């Protein structure tokens, strides 16, 4: 039987995780290793300054105390699989909220898949895009389309093989609709950012900050092939990504500059 390693960044109690387990539980042997607490926007961070501890919730379902999604995949591959063995696929998600454009560099969900890609394991990050409010999206839309997409893509990989190259993963974003309109293969778009740091003071006058979430806005391109545009049009966006961040097009200019 095929084996799937599941992780996320929303924690072990998230609705998206439960939906993903329901979607995949009868087509593969699942091992679930997720953070004990929400780790949204933790990026590809690996814990090096304190010990980590598995807590088994159910058979093959673990939460990792103080762990990140990267920790979860790293430790699962190190300790839960016999020597030389690997899962057939790693699936990270289903994330509550979008992971598009440059936001993928912040995303713990994407990092979980990227950690798998580093080990050359087929890996997918799946995110449920929200309307203006994620709680309302969960209530009104739910995760039914995301469940369908997760299962469909995993079955395609099992039947047809991995469609991307070595050390690549797929970043999948599902629009906030109930009906499946289809897939679009996309590039990562360019996000619009602005400062959302809010200063507060506690009753003792000590200052502290909350970092706010940016509204989902992007820079329109000449070609309508980015993840933002696909999701806006109601399609599931699939973006192939890799850990290699080299800007190859800049190398000749830098050589001449020196």
Curated annotation (Swiss-Prot):
Keywords: Cytoplasm, Hydrolase, Metal-binding, Nucleotide-binding
Gene3D superfamilies documented for this protein: Survival protein SurE-like phosphatase/nucleotidase (3.40.1210.10)
Cofactor binding summary note: Binds 1 divalent metal cation per subunit.
Enzyme class, first EC level, given as a word: hydrolase
Any one GO molecular-function label of the UniProt entry: metal ion binding
Binding residues for a divalent metal cation: 9-10, 40, 95
Coiled-coil annotated spans: none
Entry superkingdom: Bacteria
GO cellular component, one term: cytoplasm
Cell compartment(s), UniProt: Cytoplasm
Pfam families in the record: SurE
Obligatory cofactor(s): a divalent metal cation
Reactions accelerated catalytically: a ribonucleoside 5'-phosphate + H2O = a ribonucleoside + phosphate
EC number: 3.1.3.5
Described purpose of this protein according to its UniProt entry: Nucleotidase that shows phosphatase activity on nucleoside 5'-monophosphates.
Family listed: Belongs to the SurE nucleotidase family.
Protein name: 5'-nucleotidase SurE
